[in-house]
């Protein structure tokens, strides 16, 4: 099983400004990459207990597909990005706003309850810090 996530889902939801050339998905299987006439498809493994919640069906040109919600895509990205090792919540400011070029207003609109549910499923220090950072940002952004 797999669902569209990471950069592809972040772009789908308008959270990152860049055009994504590769369809990025998360799977309970193994890491894979396929170069096809239709494009490049990559699959990043995620442990089964971190696989849900946070997915929804979307209608695409080729039919319906399963994709991460904005909150799930962000948690998937943070958890799978091995280059990002936050020492504190403050590290998320540079990562989200400078490295990922995410708009603070759009981040403030994320569903806090859904993000908390996703982060609880991850049971990870990185995603817990993400939820706390975004909760703090929403309070100061209001």
Model-derived segments and spans:
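Hydrophobic alpha-helical interaction segments
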Residues: 54-142
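Short gly/ser-rich loop at a beta-strand->alpha-helix junction or flexible surface loop bordering the NTP-binding
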Residues: 1-50
């Amino acid at each position: 099983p797999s669902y569209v996530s990471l950069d592809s889902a972040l772009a789908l939801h308008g959270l990152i400004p860049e055009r994504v050339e590769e369809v990025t998905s998360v799977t309970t299987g193994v890491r894979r990459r396929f170069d096809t006439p239709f494009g490049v498809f990559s699959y990043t493994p995620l442990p089964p207990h971190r696989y849900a919640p946070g997915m929804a069906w979307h209608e695409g040109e080729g039919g319906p597909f399963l994709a991460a919600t904005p909150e799930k895509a962000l948690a998937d990205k943070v958890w799978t990005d091995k280059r990002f090792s936050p020492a504190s919540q403050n590290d998320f400011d540079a990562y989200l706003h400078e490295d990922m070029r995410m708009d603070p207003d759009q981040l403030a609109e994320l569903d806090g309850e859904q993000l908390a549910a996703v982060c609880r499923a991850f049971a990870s220090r990185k995603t817990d810090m993400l939820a706390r950072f975004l909760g703090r940002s929403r309070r100061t952004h209001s």
